[in-house]
């Protein structure tokens, strides 16, 4: 393995790298691509994307992967680290004319060895539902492009649903669909359901239920990616206007926002326990945002160009009770210590969530996440307890503030929330740090907006509560938000006036929305390696490997430490 050094060595593509847990190795036999293995001419093409699904096959080899390259879409058995990829036998291959696949997502809930539901978004705005095992096309949504003519940027099944899915477009709109409903032969007409700062949600105005069930307009410019929280209750969106916006998906409330240091945000992901969100974008940074505190807690600088994908590694994220261990020795010795008292993936979430601000027991917490970028580099990062639970928070006055716009003055006279002296961790902020304006509301009802949209169509929306107060913990938080959820439809003139007060992106630097670089900790990557010739577009953490892909159409498997074994061709 080449060492970091001169220009030639710096530009050399790495095939292995070492972290504290051991050696990761590129497995050439586990590389997937087009059958001819010829590098794809990626100029002007949409990013290569990869989706995985496990079919619970009796043979124990139930992993399948789908990837798009140019106008082509492939569906293969994924043999992982143990067996060589057989590129001559794709289960399904499709070549499209006039449009290109841009993204895709499997329904893990309904997947079986005989059937799997795969959504595919396209560059011209359509969404296709296919079954690559049965090799039949089920349905086409937005076929005539009457709903949206712009490129599909992200498509995902709604967690826990067999029929609902969400689609984002470069127009800045998102649409909620039901596979059981048709789209109609004319352009849909909408009526306003909910409106807030820089977002609006509309329902489809129709006598019979039809797609789309809901239309979200979020921010300005393209909506580049969205991600559901691990519990499926919240939705994080990143847009070309540089904003991260986090919504309560069911009640359609804005929970919190964050602004990039520069340029658009391109990617987003949640920590396994749902407490942190990481974004990447055109500022070449990764940014860590606390879901509980609604604030930036760290930035990471390691990339030399735009960050295209961020992802948490649930298999390396850990929490250890007791005194944090001190260590000096070899990687092998560290590996032995690492397995003592460590909880992985499942228990990490439960143990972190059980802790509260009054728990004084020492805890050693490490979240591992990764990023890939257009600079062809893979970076791995550790988010540790000295960042998560700082004893001396940087710029205390800044990090203890709550972002409220001019129409909602908080308790403090200077526009900042009151800090609590002596706390090493900032107190939780209100569940929303932006005014959850609603166009129509009934304070007495506790129904979910999303449930109402799905079950009742348009006619009953006027009676739904659009501002559920269940999560309001303190009366002062309730007052601080001026009970905006109780605005009736008669107050629409005032509401429109309020929603015109948008955050000026140019004025966010130095505020809690976008702290200055010196006001938050700056992370350095554990490793930062050039691993491809072309820009990287995929990063997925699996139990025994890491999967990356580049724009040339090569999907690479990196075996984790101790997982690389002799394989059978």
UniProtKB/Swiss-Prot annotation:
**WD-type repeats, residues:** 94-138, 139-210, 211-252, 253-331, 332-426, 427-523, 524-559
Region annotated Disordered sits at: 405-445
Q: Which Pfam families match?
A: WD40 (PF00400)
Looking up InterPro entries in the UniProt record yields:
WD40/YVTN_repeat-like_dom_sf, WD40_repeat_dom_sf, WD40_rpt, WD_repeat_creC_regulators
Q: Name one GO cellular component term.
A: cytoplasm
- PTM sites of type N-acetylalanine: 2
A molecular function (GO) held by this record is:
deubiquitinase activator activity
Q: What is its main location?
A: cytoplasm
**Which residues are recorded as modified (Phosphoserine)?**
357, 360, 432, 434, 465
Q: Where is this region: Mediates XPO1-dependent nuclear export of WDR20-USP12 complexes?
A: 450-468
For this UniProt record, give its keywords in alphabetical order, as a comma-separated list.
Acetylation, Cytoplasm, Nucleus, Phosphoprotein, Repeat, WD repeat
Q: Does the keyword Acetylation apply?
A: yes
Work out whether the entry's keyword set contains Iron-sulfur: no
From the Swiss-Prot or TrEMBL record, give the protein name.
WD repeat-containing protein 20
Give the species.
Homo sapiens (Human)
Q: Give the organism's phylogenetic lineage.
A: Eukaryota, Metazoa, Chordata, Craniata, Vertebrata
């Amino acid at each position: 393995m080449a060492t970091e050094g001169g220009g030639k060595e710096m530009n050399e593509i790495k095939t292995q790298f070492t972290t504290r847990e051991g050696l990761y190795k590129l497995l050439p036999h586990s590389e997937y691509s087009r059958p001819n293995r010829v590098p794809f001419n990626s100029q002007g093409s949409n990013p290569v994307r990869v989706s995985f699904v496990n079919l619970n096959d009796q043979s124990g080899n139930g992993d399948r992967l789908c990837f798009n390259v140019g106008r082509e879409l492939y569906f293969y058995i994924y043999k992982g680290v143990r067996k060589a990829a057989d590129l001559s036998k794709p289960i399904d291959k499709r070549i499209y004319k006039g449009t290109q696949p841009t993204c895709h997502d499997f329904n893990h809930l309904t997947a079986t060895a005989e059937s799997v539901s795969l959504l595919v978004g396209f560059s011209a705005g359509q969404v296709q539902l296919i079954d690559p095992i049965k090799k039949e096309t089920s349905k086409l949504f937005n076929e005539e492009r009457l709903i949206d003519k712009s490129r599909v940027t992200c498509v995902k099944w709604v967690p826990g649903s067999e029929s609902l899915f969400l689609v984002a477009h470069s127009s800045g709109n998102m649409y909620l669909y039901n596979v059981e409903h048709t789209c109609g032969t004319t352009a849909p007409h909408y009526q306003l359901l909910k409106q807030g700062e820089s977002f609006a949600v509309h329902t489809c105005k129709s006598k019979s239920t039809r797609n789309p069930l809901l239309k979200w307009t979020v921010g300005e410019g393209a909506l580049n990616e969205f991600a559901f929280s691990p519990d499926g209750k919240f939705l994080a969106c990143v847009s070309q206007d540089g904003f991260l916006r986090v919504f309560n998906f069911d009640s359609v409330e804005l929970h919190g926002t964050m602004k990039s240091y520069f340029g658009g945000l391109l990617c987003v992901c949640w920590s396994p326990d749902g407490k942190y969100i990481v974004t990447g974008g055109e500022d070449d940074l990764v940014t860590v945002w606390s879901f509980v505190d609604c604030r930036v807690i760290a930035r990471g600088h390691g990339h030399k160009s735009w960050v295209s994908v961020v992802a948490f590694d649930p298999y390396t994220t850990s929490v250890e009770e007791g005194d944090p261990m001190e260590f000096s020795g070899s990687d092998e010795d560290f590996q032995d210590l690492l397995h003592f008292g460590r909880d992985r993936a499942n228990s990490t979430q439960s143990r972190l969530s059980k802790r509260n601000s009054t728990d004084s027991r020492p805890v050693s917490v490490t979240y591992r996440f990764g990023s890939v970028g257009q600079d062809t580099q893979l970076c791995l990062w550790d988010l540790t307890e000295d960042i998560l639970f700082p004893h001396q928070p940087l710029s205390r006055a800044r990090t203890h503030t709550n972002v409220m716009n001019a129409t909602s003055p908080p308790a403090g006279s200077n526009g900042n929330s009151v800090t609590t002296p002596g706390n090493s961790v900032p107190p939780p902020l209100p569940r929303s740090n932006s005014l959850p304006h609603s166009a129509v509301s009934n304070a007495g009802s506790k129904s979910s907006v999303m449930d109402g949209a799905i079950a009742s169509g348009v006619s009953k929306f006027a009676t739904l509560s659009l501002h559920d107060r269940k999560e309001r913990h303190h009366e002062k938080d309730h007052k601080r938000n001026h009970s905006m959820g109780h605005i009736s439809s008669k107050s629409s003139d005032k509401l429109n006036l309020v929603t015109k007060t948008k955050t000026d992106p140019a004025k966010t630097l130095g505020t809690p929305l976008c702290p200055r670089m010196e006001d938050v900790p700056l992370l350095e990557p554990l490793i930062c390696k050039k691993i491809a010739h072309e820009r990287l577009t995929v990063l997925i953490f699996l139990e025994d490997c890491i999967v990356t892909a580049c724009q040339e159409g090569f999907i690479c498997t990196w075996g984790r430490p101790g997982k690389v074994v002799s394989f059978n061709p």
